[in-house]
Amino acid sequence: MNVTQQHKELSPDMVLSKALLNVGKALNLTQVELASIVGKDRSTLKKGIKPDSVPGQLASLVIRLYRALYVLVGGKKIDMLHWLQTENVHTRGVPVDQIQTVTGLNDVVNYLDAMRGKT
């Protein structure tokens, strides 16, 4: 099977799951942390996430967070990790801890969107 055929066979559920796992790797988040953020069991993350489900919407927010942060720091991984792991007076906490709740994830994504001028 060539690469084109392989991509055609990926369902939206699998694409979202794979994107979330890739973001997790880029941000040094474990599968356990990702699963906790999106409200799924770690063992089910690789089986796909329905985009229109609550976990799917949360996964999309995590991906949006990554994309916004990537743009803001010019794609520098060390700066992305520093931002995530450092106390932030504007978000009133440490973003990596804040994104463990739905409210915190939403607040952090909204903050990043505002910083990018996407309000």
Locate predicted features:
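Non-transmembrane "mature" sequence context
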Residues: 1-119
